[in-house]
């Protein structure tokens, strides 16, 4: 296999960036955009953090190539506490929603995957209420989102443990057009 990375340097003061690694046989990128995230906090502070990376391209399979959009994220941390840092992650979710809405304007049936370290669980405000990612497939509305990880957390499976309990911050969320597709 031959893999290639896609990376755009962002403004994160620590030099932390997000990237997308793909198999050159299975995926052909056509467009790459980095979206600046300015995390707003309750104290009035604004921090430029990691870009949200949107990679558009074609999945190559047995049939015709399938156009897909992948948004790679690493949302602001919980530094300072979950509640006091929540506005940063809510802002990140709003940016993802805005990116998706822009894609939908051009492609109403676009296929979108949202993935990365969201620093929130599927049931937290940013995922459940801002992005409106649903726990069950049947609850997903047109142009809505399904959180593929939520039910794993219900079974006690997480991606990190903190103070003796599991969290599932690393998530893959897909949109409604992908629910009926077999990729």
Question: Whereabouts are the PLM-identified features?
Answer:
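Divalent cation-coordinating acidic motifs and surrounding scaffolds
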Residues: 1-183
């Amino acid at each position: 296999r031959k893999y290639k990375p896609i990376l755009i340097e962002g403004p994160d003061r620590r030099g932390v960036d997000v990237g997308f690694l793909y198999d050159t046989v299975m995926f052909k990128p056509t467009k790459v955009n980095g979206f600046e995230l300015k995390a707003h906090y309750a104290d009035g502070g604004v921090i430029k953090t990691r870009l949200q990376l949107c990679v558009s391209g074609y999945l190559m399979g047995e049939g015709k190539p399938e156009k897909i959009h992948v948004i790679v994220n690493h949302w602001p941390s919980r530094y300072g506490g979950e509640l006091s840092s929540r506005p940063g992650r809510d802002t990140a979710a709003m940016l993802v929603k805005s990116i998706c809405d822009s894609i939908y304007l051009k492609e109403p049936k676009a296929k979108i995957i949202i993935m990365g370290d969201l620093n929130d669980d599927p049931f937290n405000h940013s995922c459940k209420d801002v992005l409106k990612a649903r726990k069950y497939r049947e609850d997903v509305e047109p142009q809505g989102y399904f959180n593929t990880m939520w039910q794993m957390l219900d079974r006690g499976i997480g991606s990190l443990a903190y103070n003796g309990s599991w969290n599932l911050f690393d998530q893959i969320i897909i949109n409604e057009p992908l629910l009926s597709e077999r990729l």
